[in-house]
Design a protein with these regions (language model features):
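Helix-loop boundary and gating motifs at the non-cytosolic
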Residues: 2-56
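Hydrophobic core of transmembrane alpha-helices in multi-pass small-molecule transporters
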Residues: 18, 86, 98-117
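Transmembrane alpha-helical cores of Major Facilitator Superfamily
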Residues: 18, 50-54, 81, 108, ...
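Intracellular juxtamembrane helix-capping segments at the cytosolic ends
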Residues: 31, 114-129
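Glycine-rich segments within core transmembrane alpha-helices of 12-TM secondary carriers
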Residues: 55-59, 135-160
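Transmembrane alpha-helix termini and helix-breaking/packing motifs in multi-pass membrane transporters
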Residues: 64-69, 91-92, 151-172
Length: 172
């Protein structure tokens, strides 16, 4: 960052890495439990959730092209917004008759956005912090990524179970 606009990394490293962990865990683990509770067949769950995880595997294919269009910081902010909106659309699609098709489509958007966020977030971390600062904040990076995993896999699953018990469930 330039000297006149320098922001302490403690203000952005935790949130960036929390935002990296949340979509990955929500799509790879929590969605499986949700679809299973909603009556989707195991074969469909396995196929579609495996497919929507591909963007994280294919990150190296589009990472070189990101800065041709906008900055890494732009992609960090934009992908966080896209991911948030797409999660909202997943939630809104669940009561619909063809919820599975819509939910998978929105989750595909989340996957591409989340993988792009990972690329951009790591890029910002590497370019904005020197080696000493990177070493200083590596613990924060890992802690908040893992906190996202815990809250998503524990807290979100608990919340979903509570809502299912109080509101009911939509069956596929």
């Amino acid at each position: 960052m330039s000297d006149n606009k320098s922001i302490n990394p403690i203000c952005w490293v935790p949130t960036v890495y929390f935002a990296m962990g949340l979509p990955f865990v929500a799509l790879s683990m929590v969605s499986v439990l949700m679809f299973s509770d909603m009556g989707v067949s195991n074969a469909q769950i396995a196929f579609w959730t495996s497919l929507i995880m591909l963007p994280w595997t294919l990150k190296p294919l589009w990472s070189p092209f990101l800065e041709m269009f906008k900055t890494k910081k732009y992609f960090v902010v934009a992908t966080q917004m896209v991911t948030g909106v797409a999660f909202g659309l997943v939630a809104l699609s669940l009561p619909l008759p063809d919820f599975f098709c819509y939910a998978i489509a929105f989750m595909g958007v989340i996957a591409f956005s989340g993988a792009t966020h990972d690329i951009a977030g790591d890029g910002v971390y590497l370019t904005e912090l020197n080696a000493t600062m990177q070493a200083k904040y590596i613990g924060w990076q890992g802690a908040f990524y893992n906190l996202a995993k815990i809250l998503t896999n524990g807290g979100l699953v608990y919340l979903a179970g509570s809502l299912k018990d109080s509101i009911g469930i939509v069956h596929a």
